[in-house]
């Protein structure tokens, strides 16, 4: 047995609070003008203040000057360019290498149209997109690791032969 306490609507204090709109849930507040005029500028100014403050307190140094007569043995690009660098390095024909790199975004653009009839969002129920994602991730990691090795081990990673 549950006891339900009903509000006393004859209470003047409760009626005053209800008249002000207290006790009612509006499920959020409007974005205009609350968020766009008040919250966003404060967050943006706070972010700019943090960046400027950190730059003033701890300025970054430029490092040692470049010496053109002391180059490293192997010049590597940044880590996020390793797969592309390795693909261009292991493909002997440069035109075919550039074409193969340009086919990656084309292939990724085709995937939504191939699986357009599938209405599910669950990755286990979208086998084509899931297999393309897994194959692309494994290939990218494989090529990225191979970019840090010598050219004879770049494709096989020294595992197979």
From Swiss-Prot:
InterPro entries for the chain: Cyt_b/b6_C, Cyt_b/b6_C_sf, Cyt_b6/f_cplx_suIV, Cytochrome_b_C_euk/bac
Gene3D superfamilies: plastocyanin oxidoreductase, Single helix bin
Primary site of residence: plastid
Cellular component, GO annotation: chloroplast thylakoid membrane
Domain of life: Eukaryota
Keyword annotations from UniProtKB, A to Z: Chloroplast, Electron transport, Membrane, Photosynthesis, Plastid, Thylakoid, Transmembrane, Transmembrane helix, Transport
Record flagged with keyword Membrane: yes
Residue ranges of the TM segments: 36-56, 95-115, 127-147
Subcellular location: Plastid, Chloroplast thylakoid membrane
Membrane topology category: Multi-pass membrane protein
GO MF annotation list: electron transporter, transferring electrons within cytochrome b6/f complex of photosystem II activity; electron transporter, transferring electrons within the cyclic electron transport pathway of photosynthesis activity; oxidoreductase activity
GO BP terms: photosynthetic electron transport chain
Family the entry assigns: Belongs to the cytochrome b family. PetD subfamily.
Role description: Component of the cytochrome b6-f complex, which mediates electron transfer between photosystem II (PSII) and photosystem I (PSI), cyclic electron flow around PSI, and state transitions.
Subunit organization: The 4 large subunits of the cytochrome b6-f complex are cytochrome b6, subunit IV (17 kDa polypeptide, petD), cytochrome f and the Rieske protein, while the 4 small subunits are petG, petL, petM and petN. The complex functions as a dimer.
Protein name: Cytochrome b6-f complex subunit 4
Biological source species: Cyanidium caldarium (Red alga)
């Amino acid at each position: 047995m549950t006891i339900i306490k009903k509000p006393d609507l004859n209470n003047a204090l409760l009626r005053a609070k209800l008249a002000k709109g207290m006790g009612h849930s509006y499920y959020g507040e409007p974005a205009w003008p609350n968020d766009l005029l008040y919250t966003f500028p404060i967050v943006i100014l706070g972010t700019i203040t943090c960046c400027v403050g950190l730059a003033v307190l701890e300025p970054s140094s430029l490092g040692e000057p470049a010496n053109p007569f002391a180059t490293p043995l192997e010049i590597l690009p940044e880590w996020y360019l390793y797969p592309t660098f390795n693909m261009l390095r292991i493909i002997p024909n440069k035109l075919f290498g550039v074409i193969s790199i340009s086919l990656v975004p084309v292939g990724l653009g085709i995937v939504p149209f191939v699986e357009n009839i599938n209405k599910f969002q669950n990755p286990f129920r979208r086998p084509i997109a899931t297999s393309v994602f897994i194959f692309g991730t494994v290939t990218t990691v494989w090529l990225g690791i191979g970019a840090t090795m010598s050219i004879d081990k770049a494709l096989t990673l020294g595992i197979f032969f």
